[in-house]
Amino acid sequence: MRSVPLVAPRRLELVEAPLPEGPRAGELLLRMRAVGLCGSDLHWWAEGRIHSTPARYPQILGHEPVGEVLAVGEGVTGFHVGEVVSVEPSLTCGHCEFCIAGRHNLCIHARFQGGPEAPGFLRDYAVIPAHNADRVPAGLSVQEATLIEPLAVWVHVYELEPVRLGDTVAVLGAGPIGLLGIAMAKQAGAEMVLACDRVPHRLDLARRMGADGTALMGERDFRELVMDLTRGRGVDIVYDAAGAPETISQGLRCLRPGGALVLIGIPEPLEFAVDLHAALARELRIQTVRRSNHKGAQAAALLAAGRIPTSLITHRMPLEQAQEGFEMLHSYADGVGKLVFDFDLKG
């Protein structure tokens, strides 16, 4: 089968790999149909690490997969050959205190498919635990269904720090995660959603996803826009999807007293300064987010109902062009929003 491992920083190679063994009891064998490219994939590719965790070469990236069921392992119910499924990429133990409490995303034994611990899905076939699969609703294309995994992160975010009717919201960073966050906030009843990014075409996408106001970083001060449009009050919630030290600091300054800063993006530097006095003086809440928590079914339902636009998907590429796809997204070329590797396309 085809596989595209990361073999060095900024270098993917198309190779032939053996088929996976299985499925064993409780597992599904999938033929991959499409995989979305995520910002965390770019961190592995560009920097060779996430936080202090180094890549382990060869490492197969890709954790926003959609596949077709080819075989069903013994004891599996609810799935049939030929069905199309999305995959929750975190392999959890099911018996630690956090799994037992229903907080699977905090599992102390978790292995993440696409990280150094377990291969991701930039390959033709994969075997997964059946309980990590979510059926793709009728009417969603395989390309659109790659949004289930990142949207599931937002469903989990809303368990922790939801938008309430009439809230004002700022989204920092208008990459794919930020764009989904804009749409989620509008669906949740936000009165106003403001967004910023340093890439002009991403702000066009932000407006298409529902942003009421945008600012290009480096051209207009985002806090000035926020204070102008909220009459000096500040927003109720800031969702930071950029993970840059400057956006995190800016997010704190954009909040009203008692507001909440939610950190979703992955910071590139291992250490950086944040003015916590700004948070203490106004009793701000700071909430971090780790992945999702088996929220794929809810995310799929939102997409199937048409409540979240899928127009952020701007590019499809065959698996053979994975290296070019990573380079495109890293350089923000060609107006790219969300890029999907479509396994049915020929390279």
Task: Describe each PLM feature range.
Residues 1-3, 249-252, 293, 297-347:
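C-terminal hydrophobic helical "lid"/dimerization subdomain
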Residues 3-22, 39-71, 86, 107-119:
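N-terminal glycine-rich cofactor-binding segment
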Residues 20-35, 50-97, 137-139:
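Glycine-rich beta-strand-centered segment in the early N-terminal region that forms part
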Residues 38, 89-134, 138:
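Cysteine-cluster motifs in flexible loop/terminal segments that predominantly coordinate metals
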Residues 131, 140-220, 224-225, 315:
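Mid-domain Rossmann-like dinucleotide-binding core that forms the NAD(H)/NADP(H) cofactor-binding site
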Residues 161, 204, 208-285, 344-347:
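Glycine-rich cofactor phosphate-binding loops and adjacent beta1-alpha1 units
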Residues 260, 273-312:
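Rossmann-fold dehydrogenase core element
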